[in-house]
């Protein structure tokens, strides 16, 4: 297919762009295969470049011969284009709708994008499983890398290489895979060097109504326990929901077969509930006519902050089991690709200082989301505005980033990255020139040959010139476990995501720049003080030597 076939009118003059908190801009609108571009005739610096893949929905209005297109983006932005001529407006709208809903992944922009920067580091090879394994293999000999899934035959949503107990052979793993949802047998998620406890994750056991068991599965997770120790199974579903899945062949671990494990049920909502929550929240944020009571009522009705609280509470429970009770844990929901990954990731941010650095967080995203099989292509296909909802869309990753922001806000000096880093990840998960978030799992990414045909997001982010934008000026390395508050008063709305297009950020940006300047000035003064102290010490040493006989 040629993109030209979808572009009925490639260029229109005298188009007026309207955006909140910006003056209207008149210019030329151009459509390419992947971008909507508006360039001002008066000022060449005034430009809009918008990826078609970032467009969630469009509305059309007509007043006489003037047409208006309202574009609603996946990053929650809303922009308005006034286009002279009804035919031109209809053609532009038709082209945008076609180009923003391309069926084939290989027609998306990452397959056509060519970087304008020098690639210093190939991000596709920055966080390989072998490298991650080396970080803790020196502290324990109880784990090994397994290549049982190298052809993706055992579990289509797992990577080719996984970490499992050394005492469990590959044949046993194949048997366990038939007992777990989607073949997702228990694998290592995190090793706590302080006490050797671990977090494992998996899909639900397929016990069904008959109470089916798998001795290899029991042996596998028991291999993570120390002598005389008990472990915890954290099921992210309520007991009622977990029991209902038994009728469909799913279920949970029976106490009789797992006597060394205590099962705890939490109530993190399934992914399809979350999409409706996001729609309600964004709708409330965009309505500027609310009085205070109405705003608070709509915010509460969205249940977004309730989801945040439930996820963070479960992550804190997991971290508490590991660090304070000295117990290993297994985490799963139903599929093991959504709430499971939210909890394992957040628990690591609480427990492990490395996950609070830029590269450590990138490694976490790579390991616990991309390689672990979170279906980004499905979950991020649409955002809060799309009219044609599919059952698999859900802001699971955005909820996770919101939880990270909540912890960052409570511990502003313990994270090497800033809020802009989290916002950038949200934007690229939904629309990007990079191939990192394409596909639903490693199997699909291999078939698409993303490493050969697209650029990794990490190749761009980890350039020194870009890193400075995402670095937290307040960062001071903190090697302690951090315990966030989950009290309702401690969990505000993330304005940087949900209100950034509805308010001017001018004064916030100026205040941030001033803070950075003050911190840099303090560092310069501290460096001068250190030099003067060193010189004073040298002078005192010389005086002492001269006075001695």
Swiss-Prot record:
Question: Which InterPro entries does the record associate with it?
Answer: Myotubularin (IPR030564), Myotubularin-like_Pase_dom (IPR010569), PH-like_dom_sf (IPR011993), Prot-tyrosine_phosphatase-like (IPR029021)
Where does it live in the cell? Cytoplasm; Cell projection, Ruffle membrane; Cytoplasm, Perinuclear region; Endoplasmic reticulum
- Domain Myotubularin phosphatase, first and last residues per copy: 123-498
A GO cellular component term found in this entry reads: cytoplasm
In terms of superkingdom, the source organism counts as Eukaryota
Q: Which family does it belong to?
A: Belongs to the protein-tyrosine phosphatase family. Non-receptor class myotubularin subfamily.
User: What PANTHER family is this protein classified in?
Assistant: MYOTUBULARIN-RELATED, MYOTUBULARIN-RELATED PROTEIN 9
Role this protein plays: Acts as an adapter for myotubularin-related phosphatases. Increases lipid phosphatase MTMR6 catalytic activity, specifically towards phosphatidylinositol 3,5-bisphosphate and MTMR6 binding affinity for phosphorylated phosphatidylinositols. Positively regulates lipid phosphatase MTMR7 catalytic activity. Increases MTMR8 catalytic activity towards phosphatidylinositol 3-phosphate. The formation of the MTMR6-MTMR9 complex, stabilizes both MTMR6 and MTMR9 protein levels. Stabilizes MTMR8 protein levels.
Q: What's the protein here called?
A: Myotubularin-related protein 9
Whichever gene encodes this chain, its name is MTMR9
């Amino acid at each position: 297919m040629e993109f030209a076939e979808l572009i009925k009118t490639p260029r229109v003059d005298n188009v007026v762009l309207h955006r909140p908190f910006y003056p209207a801009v008149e210019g030329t609108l151009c459509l390419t295969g992947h971008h909507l571009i508006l360039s001002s005739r008066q000022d060449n610096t005034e430009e809009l470049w918008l990826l078609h893949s970032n467009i969630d929905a469009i509305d059309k209005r007509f007043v006489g011969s003037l047409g208006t297109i309202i574009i609603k983006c996946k990053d929650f932005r809303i922009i308005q284009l006034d286009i002279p001529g009804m035919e031109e407006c209809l053609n532009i709208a038709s082209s945008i709708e076609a180009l923003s809903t391309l069926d084939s992944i290989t027609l998306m922009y990452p397959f056509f994008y060519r970087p304008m920067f020098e690639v210093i580091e190939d991000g596709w090879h920055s966080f390989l499983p072998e490298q991650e394994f080396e970080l803790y293999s020196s502290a324990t000999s109880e784990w090994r890398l397994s290549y049982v899934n190298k052809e993706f035959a055992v579990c289509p949503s797992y990577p080719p290489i996984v970490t499992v107990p050394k005492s469990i052979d590959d044949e046993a793993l194949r048997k366990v895979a038939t007992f777990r949802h989607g073949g997702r047998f228990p694998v290592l998620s995190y090793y706590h060097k302080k006490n050797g406890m671990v977090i494992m994750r998996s899909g639900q056991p397929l016990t069904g109504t008959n109470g089916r068991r798998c001795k290899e599965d029991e042996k596998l997770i028991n291999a993570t326990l120390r002598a005389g120790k008990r472990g915890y199974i954290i099921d992210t579903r309520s007991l009622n929901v977990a029991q209902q899945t038994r009728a469909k062949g799913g279920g949970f671990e029976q106490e009789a077969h797992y006597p060394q494990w205590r099962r705890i049920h939490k109530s993190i909502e399934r992914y399809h509930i979350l999409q409706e929550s996001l729609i309600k929240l964004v709708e409330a944020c965009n309505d500027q006519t609310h009085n205070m009571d109405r705003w608070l009522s709509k915010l509460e009705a969205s249940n977004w902050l309730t989801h945040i609280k439930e996820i963070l509470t479960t992550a804190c429970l997991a971290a508490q089991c590991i660090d304070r009770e000295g117990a290993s844990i297994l985490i799963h929901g139903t599929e093991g690709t959504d709430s499971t990954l939210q909890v394992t990731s957040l628990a690591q941010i609480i427990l492990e200082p490395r996950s609070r650095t830029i590269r450590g967080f990138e490694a976490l995203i790579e390991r616990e989301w991309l390689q672990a099989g979170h279906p980004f292509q499905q979950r991020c296909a649409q955002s809060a505005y799309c009219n044609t909802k599919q059952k698999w869309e859900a802001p699971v990753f955005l909820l996770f980033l919101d939880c990270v922001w909540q912890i960052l806000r409570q511990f502003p000096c313990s994270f090497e990255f800033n809020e802009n880093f989290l916002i950038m990840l949200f934007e690229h998960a939904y629309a990007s020139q990079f191939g990192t978030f394409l596909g639903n799992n490693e199997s699909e990414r291999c078939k698409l040959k993303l490493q050969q045909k697209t650029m990794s997001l990490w190749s761009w982010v980890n350039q020194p010139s870009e890193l400075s934008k995402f670095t937290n000026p307040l960062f001071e390395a903190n090697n302690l476990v951090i315990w966030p508050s989950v009290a309702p008063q401690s969990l505000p709305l993330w304005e940087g995501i949900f209100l950034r297009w509805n308010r001017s950020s001018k004064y916030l940006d100026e205040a941030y720049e001033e803070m950075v300047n003050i911190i840099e000035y303090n560092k310069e003064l501290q460096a001068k003080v250190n030099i003067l102290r060193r010189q004073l010490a040298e002078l005192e040493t010389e005086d002492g030597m001269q006075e001695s006989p």
